[in-house]
Amino acid sequence: MALVTFLFIATLGAMTSHVNGYAGGGWVNAHATFYGGGDASGTMGGACGYGNLYSQGYGTNTAALSTALFNNGLSCGACFEIRCQNDGKWCLPGSIVVTATNFCPPNNALPNNAGGWCNPPQQHFDLSQPVFQRIAQYRAGIVPVAYRRVPCVRRGGIRFTINGHSYFNLVLITNVGGAGDVHSAMVKGSRTGWQAMSRNWGQNWQSNSYLNGQSLSFKVTTSDGQTIVSNNVANAGWSFGQTFTGAQLR
């Protein structure tokens, strides 16, 4: 994913279908490990397509999810509160909130309890090293945890980065609040009606329409059914590689 070359913040119109916000979920048992090094440089990029997690605003509070949690990429952007439990030797007090930004692939050559941590049906979080060390000691390697879905709290609006080329508009959707995980997206040009976009990979959404020279609006729906419309966030002079900021969920 190319780095964002331009950031234009313009929230010209917004509408949400619900007003109560995302409620989250109950606590579930899982395990957690870490990857990416002490500076989390190895966590950049990833299967969600977010690229540089620092410039996208996610920082080091990130996790790669096992197959059981990743949901073929639909969980990208979801937020989880995690706490270490049942291990007095290695656990530290408190909890962390992380965003799903990557996939932890299975290793079927290893048993689930001896290296195949992300094998189905394991519920497992491979955390960035800095955030892992906030709930457990480095030497632990792997710890039992409890997790729950929580609302994502974001600064600013949802970001739409338009990549690709004519007739292949690939829109990366980031910085989504509320449930955080986009399950459907639509685009509307100033000379078109609303058109459904298909998920290409991660949180990259694709439209094969010719949208050049039109102002663009986006409609985003998250896993809890909340829908938000960002009207005319990209003006008619937009170009590929630019990022535009719209409305926000809570």
UniProtKB/Swiss-Prot annotation:
Residues 1-17 form the signal peptide. Keywords: Cell wall, Cell wall biogenesis/degradation, Disulfide bond, Membrane, Secreted, Signal. It is found in: Secreted, Cell wall; Membrane. This is Expansin-A1. InterPro entries: Expan_Lol_pI (IPR007118), Expansin (IPR002963), Expansin/allergen_DPBB_dom (IPR007112), Expansin_CBD (IPR007117), Expansin_CBD_sf (IPR036749), RlpA-like_DPBB (IPR009009), RlpA-like_sf (IPR036908). Causes loosening and extension of plant cell walls by disrupting non-covalent bonding between cellulose microfibrils and matrix glucans. No enzymatic activity has been found. It comes from Arabidopsis thaliana (Mouse-ear cress). GO terms for biological process: anatomical structure morphogenesis; plant-type cell wall loosening. Belongs to the expansin family. Expansin A subfamily. GO terms for cellular component: extracellular region; membrane. It comes from the Eukaryota. Gene3D superfamilies: Expansin, cellulose-binding-like domain, RlpA-like domain. It holds the Pfam family Expansin_C. It is a peripheral membrane protein. Expressed in stomatal guard cells and very young vascular bundles throughout the plant. Disulfide bonds join 48-76, 79-152, 84-91. The keyword Cell inner membrane does not apply. Residues 167-246 form the Expansin-like CBD domain. The keyword Secreted applies. Residues 45-157 form the Expansin-like EG45 domain.
